[in-house]
């Protein structure tokens, strides 16, 4: 399941000039790009096409979560944009995820279909507060089982959950890990974080990295250092 660059740079920009200047500094041979809600809402589908025209594969990180037909049609639209990866919330349930898988089977281009388990910003206390009487790790495990049995290609998870998920779901199940920070970087707002080398060792397939690259004085150098660390494992 793993192929191509394993580092995915999160583009958290709202200013087009800053975005263009930043992307121009990156090498599509070293990374893929993640387009999230802020960027997509600000610039629309055209930004995906423009990034792809620069040679980058795009992870469309919109975390779709709705009734089955609505979510499936959104995933179909993402496939029509030619994205490399798209995600939905596993908590949307089996019928929703199966509807998304079924609609992609009819498309000439099918992106990787990934389920979000629990957001990496949530602590165990917050997970209990919103109504799940278990730890983050337990909830991730339950949702990952549901996702795989519903036809998902993999899940988004913290690298702290990756070893257990890798053992439980096999080598072909894709594990996409945000919350990646080089050792010297601050944790920012993601509670469950690990370094790139540790994440790969623990079984992660792809690493989502944001601020350590986007806020670096030399983004390409920061990217190269992370890629080097990943390839050293």
From Swiss-Prot:
Keywords, alphabetical: Decarboxylase, Lyase, Pyrimidine biosynthesis
Catalytic activities: orotidine 5'-phosphate + H(+) = UMP + CO2
A biological process from GO: 'de novo' pyrimidine nucleobase biosynthetic process
Cellular compartments per GO CC: cytosol
Annotated pathway: Pyrimidine metabolism; UMP biosynthesis via de novo pathway; UMP from orotate: step 2/2
Coiled coil: none
Primary enzyme class: lyase
Superkingdom of the organism of origin: Bacteria
Pfam family membership, one: OMPdecase
Listed EC numbers: 4.1.1.23
One Gene Ontology term of the molecular function aspect: orotidine-5'-phosphate decarboxylase activity
InterPro entries: Aldolase_TIM, OMPdecase, OMPdecase_AS, OMPdecase_bac, OMPdeCOase_dom, RibuloseP-bd_barrel
Binding residues annotated for substrate, in chain numbering: 12, 34, 61-70, 120, 181, 190, 210-211
Active-site positions on this chain: 63
Physiological role: Catalyzes the decarboxylation of orotidine 5'-monophosphate (OMP) to uridine 5'-monophosphate (UMP).
Subunit structure: Homodimer.
HAMAP family: OMPdecase_type1_B
Recorded family membership: Belongs to the OMP decarboxylase family. Type 1 subfamily.
Protein name (database record): Orotidine 5'-phosphate decarboxylase
Gene: pyrF
